[in-house]
Amino acid sequence: MPLPEPSEQEGESVKASQEPSPKPGTEVIPAAPRKPRKFSKLVLLTASKDSTKVAGAKRKGVHCVMSLGVPGPATLAKALLQTHPEAQRAIEAAPQEPEQKRSRQDPGTDRTEDSGLAAGPPEAAGENFAPCSVAPGKSL
C-alpha cells in the first residue's frame, strides 16, 4: 500500500489542527440604537390660513412662520402683522404691483380698478422686505 507523500500529510495535519472557521458574515455584532438628536429651535412650516394656528405657533417660541403652498399676501400678512407693523405696510403694498402690471398688459380689465391703483406709488415700494426678520435670540 503506497504511503501518501509528506506534503499531503502536512496539509491534512494543518487542516485537522485548525478550528473550523465560521461562514463569512455570520459574526455580525448589532450596533446599539442611537437616540435621535433634539433640535432646540425648529422652523414651523404651515399651509394653514387659520390665524389662530399661527398665533399658537407664536406662543411656542417659533422664530419664523412659513407656508408650503402659494399663499396670498393676506395669509402672509396675518402671520407677520401681529408683531411687525413695518412689515404690514410692505405686505399691503406688495400685491398692488402685480395687479398694476397685469392691468397694463390686459386692456380688458375694469378701468375703475386701474384708477385706484394708479393714484400713487405703494407706500413701501423702495424698501427691502425680509419675511423672517426676527433675530434668533428673540421670540415672536
From Swiss-Prot:
Comp. bias intervals (Low complexity): 118-127
**One family name in Pfam for this protein:** FLYWCH_N
Record region (Disordered): 1-39, 84-140
GO molecular function list? RNA binding
Please verify whether the record's keywords include Transmembrane: no
| Annotated protein name in UniProt | FLYWCH family member 2
Recorded superkingdom: Eukaryota
Which InterPro entries does its entry note? FLYWCH_N, FWCH1/FWCH2
Q: Which residues carry this modification: Phosphoserine?
A: S21
Report keywords, A-Z: Phosphoprotein
Q: Indicate, by first and last residue, each region the UniProt record lists as having compositional bias (Basic and acidic residues).
A: 98-114
